[in-house]
Amino acid sequence: MIGILGGMGTQAGLDFCNKLAVLNRGKIDQEYPLFLLYNKSNIPGRPESIGSQTKNLSNKSTNKNSKIKYERVLRSLLKGCKLLEKNKCRFIVIPCNTAHYWYDDLQKKINIPIINMPKEVFKFTKKNCKKNSKVGLLATEGTLKTGVYNNFFDEEYNLLKPSDDRPQCGFVRAPDQPR
């Protein structure tokens, strides 16, 4: 069974479930994939829990306040992952890019794999795009702040994303807007 930790953008979790069903369409109900969606919408805000001085995963807790916020989100995400693990899920998917900022710490604390979404996007890109290609990243401010995609793309691709010297207005807010 697939475990889906949603609620960090409830629509994102539901959209993932819909795509999972459409892409794995069975002829009868019993041929659809088994999955358990935990819509854990009470996880503290991820963007607010990333230290303002934090630039990458190796510098997660730059000050006491950032560390407290980081740990609060980690505990909440971990509770969700543990519930999915307890319910016999074989692996976990988290359809929230920003939540992957906590990926390494989460994976260390549970016994089933968590699919690393930025890593999977990188593998897809590597398979379909030439090395050193320009690749655009449409993402929320929280995802951009975490740098979770930089960790994979920086050495092999020219990752194009909004920066402080370019206006971000509608471009960055778009992924957060209701459809």
Model-based region annotation:
Residues 1-179:
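Non-catalytic structural scaffold of enzyme domains
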